[in-house]
Curated annotation (Swiss-Prot):
The active site is at residue 324. Heterotrimer of UreA (gamma), UreB (beta) and UreC (alpha) subunits. Three heterotrimers associate to form the active enzyme. It comes from Staphylococcus aureus (strain bovine RF122 / ET3-1). The lineage of its organism: Bacteria, Bacillati, Bacillota, Bacilli, Bacillales. Belongs to the metallo-dependent hydrolases superfamily. Urease alpha subunit family. Carboxylation allows a single lysine to coordinate two nickel ions. It catalyses: urea + 2 H2O + H(+) = hydrogencarbonate + 2 NH4(+). This is Urease subunit alpha. PROSITE patterns: UREASE_1 (PS01120), UREASE_2 (PS00145), UREASE_3 (PS51368). It is an enzyme of class 3 (hydrolase). Pathway: Nitrogen metabolism; urea degradation; CO(2) and NH(3) from urea (urease route): step 1/1.
Length: 571
């Protein structure tokens, strides 16, 4: 006869199942389980008296040579991804995800997709949430410690430019020229995350751009501090089309070389990644935001203006002055800073993210943004928009799955697609690098419990090393074995251009990390942005800066209180 238990009993043992909902941190968002891959009564769990034992859920005879035998199983996890909210086991082998389904011993269990053998380790995720490692595509490489801070927030990939604490790096996400690109590729060998570097996109001589792509740059950054002229942008796009790389644009705030319409005329119908499309981080005053309506523009915005709060405007004036090397004694520099900080367009930014008009969220690290707050601020925006705008179509009480899928795509799959790395990272799918973040639901979006990088635990909350148990205080983030010895290079990827990859940049520089080429970029359009592909008509009133979507004014109220804030940072 079958054994019956209550829903609460089941959840306490194996985690939530179909129809159950999980609150994300202290937000107003609830994820509801859409599917459970487990066979009820045959769940694989680890521990004393549990089922993952020899001859039970662990197969006693198979070896690692069997393709279905996992090196690592993350058991009974709630997977939140751009296309699913499911309960499943995750099978990892050789550092890659090879299956999502039901783990156990097929000799005695039904519908087993992932075999647990004597060579398999277990991460118990009952009652926990698993997400793909986040991708930050607007990183100023100013300080190597950014990587560790980002990793401890759930980010596992950085894309951008810089060479350290130079003025060019502080202001622009640029690694200029072959020599700097090579040195940064070598420096990346010591970082615990995936990286890709963008070169400088300002040159009328295409050879000066091509040599950077050949050196390993995964794209070019056109930035107003170097001169974001229509000519420079057009030349950069010509090279991008030839070599299948991305162009990231920080447009012309002062409209010195033309207006938003002139920039779009130079772009024509070619795809590019528009940085901080809201305009506060830079770009055509006051209407850069209109570019998000174009089907060839892949728009992102950065976390310092997200979500809109009563402190946002005041904070930004000082940040602009410092980041862009401005002088408070020069009236024109003050005017430059003032022109970028428009509360009306900032207030519209949250709404455009919620509507799926803006497709991505990134940091703008140490150049007006915070490298460890991409994920936190993403979910704060989602909370605020549910609070102000109500549930999205298809969502209902205790089920915000559509909004959750929209927002998680903004820092996982969409950045990966935009920069040509979605074959490798960006989602929890078979065939992708096992960059996986495990969360206690109470701390979701703020403090991960552990981060798996390339199939190995890279960072985790752990206790005193002299403690009798792993939870002895002080509990804090600690480097795990994924950051030691050869694992530092064998579990992370360095992304380069296809031409650099084919010409053996890894051998030329003696790189030990997994080197992979970016690809499939130039044919992209906004329609490729998962859950964030809306292209409505956008207008900005040139006098009031008010933003209109299909003729309707949009705005949001400045928040005075947010979730995922001080109660999580008392210690």
């Amino acid at each position: 006869m079958s054994f019956k238990m209550t829903q609460n009993q089941y959840t306490s043992l194996y985690g939530p199942t179909v129809g159950d909902s999980i609150r994300l941190g202290d937000t107003n968002l609830f994820a509801q389980i859409e599917k459970d891959y487990a066979v009820y009564g045959e769940e694989a769990t680890f521990g004393g008296g549990k089922s993952i034992r020899d001859g039970m859920a662990q197969n006693p005879r198979v070896t690692r040579d069997d393709v279905n035998v996992a090196d690592l199983v993350i058991s009974n996890a709630v997977i939140i991804d751009y296309d699913k909210v499911v309960k499943a086991d995750i099978g990892i082998k050789n550092g890659y995800i090879f299956a999502i389904g039901n783990a156990g011993n097929p000799d005695i269990m039904d519908n087993v997709d992932i075999i647990i053998g004597s060579t398999t380790d277990i991460i118990a995720a009952e009652g926990k949430i698993v997400t793909a490692g986040g991708i930050d595509t607007h990183v100023h490489f100013i300080n190597p410690e950014q990587a560790e801070v980002a990793l401890e927030s759930g980010i596992t990939t950085h894309i951008g430019g810089g060479t350290g604490a130079s003025e060019g790096s502080k202001a622009t996400t640029v690694t200029p020229g072959p020599w700097h690109i090579h040195r940064m590729l070598e420096a990346a060998e010591g970082l615990p995350i995936n990286v890709g570097f963008t070169g400088k996109g300002q040159a009328t001589n295409p050879t000066a751009l091509i040599e950077q792509i050949n050196a390993g740059a995964i794209g070019l950054k056109v930035h107003e501090d170097w001169g974001a002229t229509p000519s420079a942008l057009s030349h950069a796009l010509d090279v991008a089309d030839e070599f299948d790389v991305q162009i990231a644009l920080h447009a012309d705030t002062l409209n010195e070389a033309g207006f938003m319409e002139d920039t779009m005329a130079a772009v024509k119908d070619r795809v590019l990644h528009m940085y901080h499309t809201e305009g506060a981080g830079g770009g055509h005053t006051p209407d850069l935001i209109k570019s998000a309506a174009f089907s060839n523009i892949l728009p992102s915005s950065t976390n310092p203006t997200l979500p809109y709060t009563h402190n946002t405007v005041d904070e930004h004036l000082d940040m602009v002055m410092i980041t862009h090397h401005l002088n408070a004694a020069i009236p024109e520099d003050i005017a430059f800073a003032d022109s970028r900080i428009r509360k009306e367009t900032i207030a519209a930014e949250d709404v455009l993210q919620d509507m799926g008009v803006f497709s991505m969220i990134s940091s703008d690290s140490q150049a007006m943004g915070r490298v460890g707050e991409v994920i936190t601020r993403t979910w704060q925006v989602a909370h605020r928009m549910k609070e102000q705008r109500g549930p999205l179509d298809g969502d209902f009480e205790h089920n915000d799955n559509n909004r959750i899928k929209r927002y998680i795509a903004k820092y996982t799959i969409n950045p990966a697609i935009t920069h040509g790395i979605s074959e490798y990272v960006g989602s929890i799918e078979p065939g992708k690098l096992a960059d996986i973040v495990l969360w206690d639901p109470i701390f979701f979006g703020v403090k991960p419990e552990l981060v798996v990088k390339g199939g190995l635990i890279n960072s985790a909350v752990n206790g005193d090393a002299n403690g009798s148990i792993p939870t002895s205080e002080p509990m804090k983030y600690r480097k795990m074995y994924g950051q030691y010895g050869g694992n530092l290079t064998s579990t992370s990827m360095t992304f380069v251009s296809k031409t650099a990859y084919e010409n053996g940049i890894n051998r030329a520089l003696n790189l030990k990390r997994m080197v992979r080429p970016v690809k499939n970029i130039r044919q992209l359009s906004k329609a490729d942005m998962k859950n964030n592909s809306a292209t409505p008509k956008l207008d900005v009133d040139p006098q009031t800066y008010e933003v209109y979507v299909d003729g309707e004014k949009i705005t949001s109220n400045a928040a005075t209180e947010l979730p995922l804030t001080q109660r999580y940072f008392l210690f």
